[in-house]
Amino acid sequence: MTSKYQYHFTKKAEADLDEILSYISIELSNPEAAASFLKDFLAVLTSICSVPKIGSIVKNEFLPNKEIRKSLVGNYVLYYLPDIKEKRIYVLRLLYGRRNLDELVREINHF
């Protein structure tokens, strides 16, 4: 699969990924699972870079006229914003799937 788009992590998304990998590797004492999660994450990100609209649109009253999308990575949700003109994927957040969506969307809205 050839990537058409480049990706860019927000500082929060970078911190999210670091936190998840540390939690799995250190807190759960399972570095193999952390490596597996990273592999799955990169596979999803590669798919998104090839087909930016592959994820479903996040529908929420706090996001009017936005194209923020989401894709699953295991028990986590990857939130991203495709920029068609710049051919760039902005990785906004990577969060545990049961987190409060309204709270998250308010944060993303200030991107």
Regions found by a protein language model. Name each.
Residues 51-85:
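Basic/aromatic recognition patch in beta-strand/loop cores that engages polyanionic ligands
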Residues 73-77, 81-111:
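Enriched for short, Lys/Arg-rich terminal
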Residues 21, 49-56, 102:
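Short amphipathic alpha-helical interaction/hinge segments
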Residues 1-40:
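Arg/Lys-rich, positively charged N-terminal/basic patches that mediate binding to nucleic acids
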Residues 42-46, 50:
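Compact soluble domain cores
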Residues 2, 52, 58, 90, ...:
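Residue-level signal for pocket-adjacent positions within structured domains
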Residues 36-37, 54-57, 111:
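Juxtamembrane/interface motifs at transmembrane-helix termini
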